[in-house]
Swiss-Prot record:
It comes from Mus musculus. Residues 30-122, 133-216 form the Ig-like C2-type domain. Glycans are attached at residues 37, 151, 192, 333, 339, 395. Residues 221-325, 330-422 form the Fibronectin type-III domain. The chain crosses the membrane at residues 446-466. Belongs to the protein kinase superfamily. Tyr protein kinase family. AXL/UFO subfamily. GO terms for cellular component: actin cytoskeleton; cell surface; extracellular space; intracellular membrane-bounded organelle; plasma membrane. Disulfide bonds join 50-111, 154-199. Heterodimer and heterotetramer with ligand GAS6. Interacts with CBL, GRB2, LCK, NCK2, PIK3R1, PIK3R2, PIK3R3, PLCG1, SOCS1 and TNS2. Part of a complex including AXL, TNK2 and GRB2, in which GRB2 promotes AXL recruitment by TNK2. Residues 820-846, 865-888 are annotated as: Disordered. ATP binds at residues 536-544, 561. It catalyses: L-tyrosyl-[protein] + ATP = O-phospho-L-tyrosyl-[protein] + ADP + H(+). This is Tyrosine-protein kinase receptor UFO.
């Protein structure tokens, strides 16, 4: 019992000593609570708190970090009275909030107050930052040539330290985390395929992964660009392609510019003073012949080759020059004047391009019974001939030609002698031994006059040809301006003997694939059997004309579809012909069929233009027909029976195409045609594809597509199936039901995908049968498997058509006269209001009346035109829209 009181006594003494020590440490300080310590990860939120008790008015608490005042600190101060008299004693609590903790927030924090002229500072609290590594630098995307070294950078920091980096290529680690050093820079010797790189930062808290950088491998710069052969109008160049990794080269682009004065100023720069013209060529071979160039003309060329990953860097500009050519025309104004035994011959330099450096002139003269004599005159343009001998020279004529290092140019027409006239200048004495002259035996003035007339005709023809050549080619006709896709067109002039070429030679000259040529051989038609008529429609790249095809026993009225090959690229030519051969396999009353293909010579270039021969469609395309029936000068009413028949025809044609494993991809009312029997034919197979394996087709290249008609899965993944055409058919049904309205009015093309993903669909048209709209809605199911087949659609539409009553003339017709003064009439009667329209006076009535069908949903009033607007039943013909009465 004696030991226990002793232990309590010792403990009480120790507590008293400690309390005395704390009182000394905190003597006079008002702080009763000091800031604590915070350790957190980057981005977290922390709070520091301090408390003090004071007598009298509460002071303002200021926060310090590392001894510096925090001017913009997010702190709150709370004051609580402790005594009954609020002026006696106060408790003050200050809280500092640190949001989104960063490395700069770490340090020592204290509270500071000023009381009675003294400054008091609390005990410090510490804020530390510890968490996952933070990236200061991440790898960036790059495009590098194949097998070319490059560097990537990545840098991260803690705390806590140390931070080590691990590089990954295509999600595979390149090296393990070892040691305490970070590999900030990755040096790669080169790649042969496009790869992705990222880095991982490791510390004691865990791992952070950087962004993924894509390194695209491009072909190396081509090298050894050189000239293989030179001609006056041709250059053959070759080059060695650079490495392209695992991606084969698809094509090369050749740029060429004329070397104007001052070319040396921009030769070392990337861009010349004017935009160069670009020619795209397929490879291999890595060789190209440039034709139709200007003789004796300097050019600069460079080359870049492309793979599926992108283009290589351009080579340096290479100066090249064509060789000299012969002069294009003879010397001008050749004259030969006789003065006794001397003949003075004069001429002027050719006005047309010399195509080289003029080296001199050659002169030839001969008489009626004497051989021709050739002389090299040099660069002079005047020479005197002295005729000697016993025999006179009868009917002497003179011709002159200019020559360059490439040879002689054209000779001038033979010029007869003229008598000497005073004032012609002093002749040069170039003596030539000849027999003595004798008088001409017949009047030579007539010969001179005829020669002058002939020379004038030749001169006019030569000037016309030269002017045409200058106008058509600055670069010699090898290059043409760019077209919409950015490709360049190679144009050339063939001989006028094109009409004698065989079909095989014509196909070979087009530069198309062997597979397409094989298909075209089966559908070729003799060009002379086709007669062209008026133009039905014309666009930027082609036209449709009315024509006649002479068959063995009859003449068939056809539509002829042509292409302006002078402004189209080779790929567009192949697309045009592929659409034609696509139709040769079709044999169905509701599918456009192909009659044949032929080629005609271009009047301007002589290059064969493709011509596709199709059946003649009297009423044009379905969309225009529907639109003009509603908005044309003479609107007509289309009964529901006719609209349903249009839908059934299209469904029947698409059912046939689906059985042939064809995907249309561009089904719309504009691509359906109406023949003379008002039957619809599915047409325009420019985007159609035949699927040989499986039941879908994935589009490889980005092409212009009608997004408002495309199925939602095709917009997302560019995957097309027969059920994608079913979606488009539903939109086409909506077009027909609305008489040609545009789908999704008010919705931009760029917004269609999001609009459909939200579950939105086309609304039910006015006066559309509920069953028809339900059929449309089934075509727009999100899951393609839930959509009906074309066989089901055709059957449902045919049953709907059978269930409808026969089309008859409307029982209730409303006639409204809309004269110039009709604008003051009350509109509510005509719009379906309670009051009927006032009956006009018969004497003021216009003889031009418009019939409007009255439905249960409301009445329609159509403004009159110069002739009454008839109603159209399913078994009656319908006038075509203006400008569309004929067409394919």
């Amino acid at each position: 019992m004696g030991r226990v009181p002793l232990a309590w006594w010792l403990a009480l003494c120790c507590w008293g000593c400690a309390a005395h020590k704390d009182t000394q440490t905190e003597a006079g300080s008002p702080f009763v609570g000091n800031p604590g310590n915070i350790t957190g990860a980057r981005g977290l939120t922390g709070t520091l708190r301090c408390e003090l008790q004071v007598q009298g008015e509460p002071p303002e608490v200021v926060w310090l970090r590392d001894g510096q005042i925090l001017e913009l600190a997010d702190n709150t101060q709370t004051q609580v009275p402790l005594g009954e008299d609020w002026q006696d004693e106060w408790k003050v609590v200050s809280q500092l909030r640190i949001s989104a903790l960063q490395l700069s927030d770490a340090g020592e924090y204290q509270c500071m107050v000023h009381l009675e002229g003294r400054t008091f500072v609390s005990q410090p609290g510490f804020v530390g930052l510890e968490g996952l590594p933070y990236f200061l630098e991440e790898p960036e995307d790059k495009a590098v040539p194949a097998n070319t070294p490059f560097n990537l950078s990545c840098q991260a920091q803690g705390p806590p330290e140390p931070v080590t980096l691990l590089w990954l290529q295509d999600a595979v680690p390149l090296a393990p985390v070892t040691g305490h050093s970070s590999q900030h820079s990755l040096q790669t010797p080169g790649l042969n395929k496009t790869s992705s790189f990222s880095c991982e930062a490791h510390n004691a808290k865990g791992v952070t992964t950087s962004r993924t950088a894509t390194i695209t491998v491009l072909p190396q710069r081509p090298h050894h660009l050189h000239v293989v052969s030179r001609q006056p109008t041709e250059l053959e160049v070759a080059w060695t392609p650079g490495l392209s990794g695992i991606y084969p080269l698809t094509h090369c682009n050749l740029q060429a510019v004329l070397s104007d004065d001052g070319v040396g100023i921009w030769l070392g720069k990337s861009d010349p003073p004017e935009d160069p013209l670009t020619l795209q060529v397929s490879v291999p071979p890595h060789q190209l012949r440039l034709e139709k160039l200007l003789p004796h003309t300097p050019y600069h060329i460079r080359i870049s080759c492309s793979s599926s990953q992108g283009p290589s860097p351009w080579t340096h500009w290479l100066p090249v020059e064509t060789t000299e050519g012969v002069p294009l025309g003879p010397p001008e104004n050749v004259s030969a004047m006789r003065n006794g035994s001397q003949v003075l011959v004069r001429w002027q330099e050719p006005r047309v391009p010399l195509q080289g450096t003029l080296l001199g002139y050659r002169l030839a003269y001969r008489g009626q019974d004497t051989p021709e004599v050739l002389m090299d005159i040099g660069l002079t343009r005047e020479v005197t001939l002295e005729l000697r001998g016993d025999r006179p020279v009868a009917n002497l004529t003179v011709s002159v030609t200019a020559y360059t290092s490439a040879g002689d140019g054209p000779w001038s027409l033979p010029v007869p002698l003229e008598p000497w006239r005073p004032g012609q200048g002093q002749p040069l004495h170039h003596l030539v031994s000849e027999p003595p002259p004798r008088a001409f035996s017949w009047p030579w003035w007539y010969v001179l006059l005829g020669a002058l007339v002939a020379a004038a005709c030749v001169l006019i023809l030569a000037l016309f040809l030269v002017h045409r050549r200058k106008k058509e080619t600055r670069y010699g006709e090898v290059f043409e301006p760019t077209v919409e896709r950015g490709e360049l067109v190679v144009r050339y002039r063939v001989r006028k003997s094109y009409s004698r070429r065989t079909t095989e030679a014509t196909l070979n000259s087009l530069g198309i694939s062997e597979e397409l040529k094989e298909k075209l051989r089966d559908v070729m038609v003799d060009r002379h059997k086709v007669a062209l008529g008026k133009t039905l429609g014309e666009g930027e790249f082609g036209a449709v004309m009315e024509g006649q095809l002479n068959q063995d026993d009859s003449i068939l009225k056809v539509a002829v579809k042509t292409m302006k090959i002078a402004i189209c690229t080779r790929s567009e030519l192949e697309d045009f012909l592929s659409e034609a051969v696509c139709m040769k396999e079709f044999d169905h009353p509701n599918v456009m069929r192909l009659i044949g293909v032929c080629f005609q010579g271009s009047d301007r270039e002589g290059f064969p233009e493709p011509v596709v021969i199709l059946p003649f469609m009297k009423h044009g395309d379905l969309h225009s027909f529907l639109l003009y029936s509603r908005l044309g000068d003479q609107p007509v009413f289309l009964p529901t029976q006719m609209l349903v028949k249009f839908m059934a025809d299209i469904a029947s044609g698409m059912e046939y195409l689906s059985t042939k494993r064809f995907i249309h991809r561009d089904l719309a009312a504009r691509n359906c045609m109406l023949n003379e029997n008002m039957s619809v034919c599915v047409a325009d197979f420019g985007l159609s594809k035949k699927i040989y394996n499986g039941d879908y087709y994935r589009q490889g290249r980005i092409a212009k597509m009608p997004v408002k008609w495309i199925a939602i899965e095709s917009l997302a993944d560019r995957v097309y199936t027969s059920k994608s055409d079913v979606w488009s058919f539903g939109v086409t049904m909506w077009e027909i039901a609305t008489r040609g309205q545009t789908p999704y009015p008010g919705v931009e093309n760029s917004e269609i995908y999001d609009y459909l993903r939200q579950g939105n669909r086309l609304k039910q048209p006015v006066d559309c049968l509920d069953g028809l709209y339900a059929l449309m809605s089934r075509c727009w199911e999100l899951n393609p498997r839930d959509r009906p087949s074309f066989a089901e659609l055709r059957e449902d539409l045919e049953n709907t058509l059978k269930a409808l009553p026969p089309a008859q003339e409307p029982d209730e017709i409303l006639y409204v006269n809309m004269d110039e003064g009709g604008s003051h009439l009350e509109p509510r009667g005509a719009a379906g209001g309670a009051d009927p329209p006032t009956q006009p006076d018969p004497k003021d009535s216009c003889s031009c009346l418009t019939a409007a069908d009255v439905h249960s949903a409301g009445r329609y009033v159509l403004c009159p035109s110069t002739a009454p607007g008839p109603t159209l039943s399913a078994d009656r013909g319908c006038p075509a829209p203006p400008g569309q009465e004929d067409g394919a």
